[in-house]
Amino acid sequence: MRRIGIIGVLVLGLTGCTSPEKMEFVETGGEEIETSEWIGTLVEDVPKGTESLSDAVVHQITLQYKDGSERRLATKDVIYEAKVGDIGLIAIGHPNQMPSFGVYHYSRDGEWIMRGMKHFGIVGVSEKTQHGLALPQDSMYIIDSEIDDSERPVKLWTLYDETQLVTILMTDAFSVGDGEPINQNADGAERYRLNQPSGNGLYYISQDKLILVTGNVSEEELLTLVDSLPDPSSESFPFHNSK
């Protein structure tokens, strides 16, 4: 089985890598828990015939730590798992690095193919913000990424804190048959509920863009967040301001 070693990957969007986050300590209610420092990621091929997105990422990703140990991801740590059309999006907690997470973006053409990943955590990140959105919490950390795929460019924004994580994905609209209609937005865009094995998710199409919103929060909280999003054509999308 082919293994690709990516040392210090923070973002992988088919190309490029950057320095890893250092997460030697995790704050948990005032108690410091020492953890190994993550230094890289091994990416293996997804076994042919893999149907489940969670099985795909668990088979594919191994985290490497400074002390020489390796940890595979586990399906029990999946935070959300969403599929719309041929797009797959999954978030999973990282072993031995809590609270630390990974968001993995896949596409499927017969088999699951990873298009990008983002690793992030709580330690050392900037302050929580709100950006004029109706968030599940008063404010949350925000991290974004962009996958410059010639076939279908994708932008992602993940809003998170110690326990909750919501990702907003925007890409060019395409014909989709997934989901159950929920209601219409003021602009007439129909929202569709996704049947997810983990977390809740919905999507809608507006101004020639498909917007997917998914996370480990209630559907009501997702709908409230979606109601607060600006138009996809807004330069600041998904935010109302830059601060």
Regions found by a protein language model. Name each.
Residues 1-4:
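Positively charged n-region of N-terminal signal peptides that target proteins for export
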Residues 6-11:
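Hydrophobic helical h-region of N-terminal Sec-dependent signal peptides
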Residues 13-16:
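C-terminal motif of bacterial Sec signal peptides marking the signal peptidase cleavage site
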Residues 18-79, 86-91, 116-117, 121-143, ...:
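N-terminal, intrinsically disordered, polar/charged segments of Gram-positive cell-envelope systems
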Residues 60, 79-81, 87-95, 121-206:
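Short, solvent-exposed recognition patches
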Residues 68-115, 199-203:
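Exposed beta-strand-loop-beta-strand "reactive/processing" segments of non-cytosolic proteins
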Residues 102-123, 219-229:
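Repeat-associated, polar segments at repeat-unit boundaries in modular proteins
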Residues 210-243:
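Surface-exposed amphipathic alpha-helical segments
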